[in-house]
């Protein structure tokens, strides 16, 4: 696990900006938030900051994984969850050498990983045979999990509605503004009236700044548009069992139930979640080149979403200047990876409990 902001990104930025099929695409807008985010991102592209961010993300991810294991063991939930490991594949020797150095650093933080050569990669994941000649090596993390996030959210909703203290969900209600009173919130104004509560948790992704800025609170969150394809697996041996990340192309492949989920791209191109057909075609080409026998492309389901990214890659969680307003935003592409940890931390803080892990680097200043 490593942040996007790192020294290795700097030399890649010029070619990324010039190529239409680059994994990171930038379309400048007359948007102060976009340019400020870009400057803060570039400032974070140094080794010291990258190492610190890596340590913090691993700390949070390990905690989230332990909470996930507790949940799966204690509750009967079905979301195609499986612990199948992950391979991060590198196609350039220099990139692989850098990944090995990062692996050694992450090992010092108790991350279980090992480096594999191309032959070992294909032995572990035979579906990678079509990529073998392009591979320099891969980093294997056996403890990685996958699951269907949509099913997971529905299962959590079911559990919360059926528990001893049932939760009421109010879908379709639009939050218009937060109502501060001195050092607290007195309510939330919505399209159906004012809602009042003891505590308020703001977990709105890229929409968080719109509600916080009138209160004088700035969170460095800006949308990075990402894409995914969901494809039926038509050849079991042709589709990967282990999750695979193509490091150069920034594309992730994961078997989820009977489907292959393919996700990638990062478009810094404004705040509109509109699917770009060209980006979908590029993802299709990546799948066809890497796992040509895996699926039937005529049945693909494309999707795009706005990742709430911070320049450093760390979420913003915890307290604000209003005593009963809490933040849980800025997870970027790691929402599912970090969600249980950040949710538990905010719940602990609101209840007056001490969180299980240190929060340096996550608190809003």
What do the predicted segments below correspond to?
Residues 97-109, 129-199:
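Helical element adjacent to the flavin cofactor pocket in flavoenzyme catalytic cores
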Residues 166-168, 260, 325:
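Short, conserved active-site loop motifs that form the nucleotide-linked donor/cofactor pocket
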Residues 1-118:
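Dinucleotide-binding Rossmann-like beta1-alpha1 core, especially the glycine-rich loop
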Residues 115, 128, 178-182, 233, ...:
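C-terminal lid/capping helical subdomain adjacent to the catalytic/cofactor pocket in oxidative enzymes
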Residues 1-45, 129, 175-186, 194-323:
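Active-site substrate-recognition segment that forms the wall
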Residues 114-116, 168-170, 300:
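General small-molecule cofactor/ligand-binding pocket signal
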Residues 52-65, 88-98, 138-158, 274-282, ...:
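Short beta-strand to alpha-helix junction loop
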Residues 70-82, 162-168, 217, 291-298, ...:
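Surface-exposed helix-capping loop/turn segments at secondary-structure junctions
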């Amino acid at each position: 696990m490593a942040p996007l902001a790192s020294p290795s990104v700097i030399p890649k930025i010029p070619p990324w900006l010039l190529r239409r099929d680059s994994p990171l695409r930038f379309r400048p807008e007359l948007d102060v938030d976009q340019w400020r985010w870009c400057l803060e991102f570039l400032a974070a592209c140094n080794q010291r900051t990258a190492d610190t961010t890596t340590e913090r993300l691993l700390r949070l991810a390990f905690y989230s994984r332990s909470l996930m294991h507790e949940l799966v063991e204690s509750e009967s939930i079905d979301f195609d969850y499986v612990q199948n490991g992950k391979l991060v594949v590198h196609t350039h020797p220099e990139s692989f050498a850098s990944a090995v150095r990062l692996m050694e650093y992450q090992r010092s933080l108790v991350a279980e990983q090992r480096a594999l050569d191309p032959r070992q990669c294909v032995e572990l994941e035979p579906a990678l045979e079509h990529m073998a000649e392009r591979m320099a090596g891969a980093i294997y993390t056996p403890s990685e999990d996958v699951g269907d996030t949509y099913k997971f959210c529905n299962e959590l909703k079911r559990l919360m509605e059926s528990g001893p203290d049932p939760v009421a969900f109010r879908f379709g209600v639009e939050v218009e503004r937060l109502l501060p009173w001195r050092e607290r919130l007195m309510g939330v104004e919505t399209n159906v009236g004012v809602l009042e509560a003891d505590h308020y948790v703001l977990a709105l992704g890229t929409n968080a700044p719109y509600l916080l800025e009138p209160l004088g609170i700035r969170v460095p969150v800006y949308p990075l548009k990402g894409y995914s394809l969901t494809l039926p697996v038509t050849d079991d041996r042709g589709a990967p069992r282990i999750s695979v990340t193509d490091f150069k192309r920034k594309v992730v492949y994961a078997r989820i139930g009977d489907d292959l989920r393919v996700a990638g791209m990062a478009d810094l191109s404004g705040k509109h979640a509109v699917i770009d057909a060209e980006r979908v075609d590029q993802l299709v080409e990546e799948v066809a080149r890497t796992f040509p026998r895996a699926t039937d492309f005529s049945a693909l389901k494309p999707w795009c979403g706005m990742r709430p990214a911070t320049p450093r890659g760390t979420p913003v969680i915890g307290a604000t200047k209003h005593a009963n307003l809490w933040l849980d935003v800025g997870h970027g592409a790691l929402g599912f990876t970090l969600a249980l940890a950040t949710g538990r931390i905010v719940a602990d803080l609101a209840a007056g409990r001490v969180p299980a892990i240190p929060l340096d680097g996550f608190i809003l200043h």
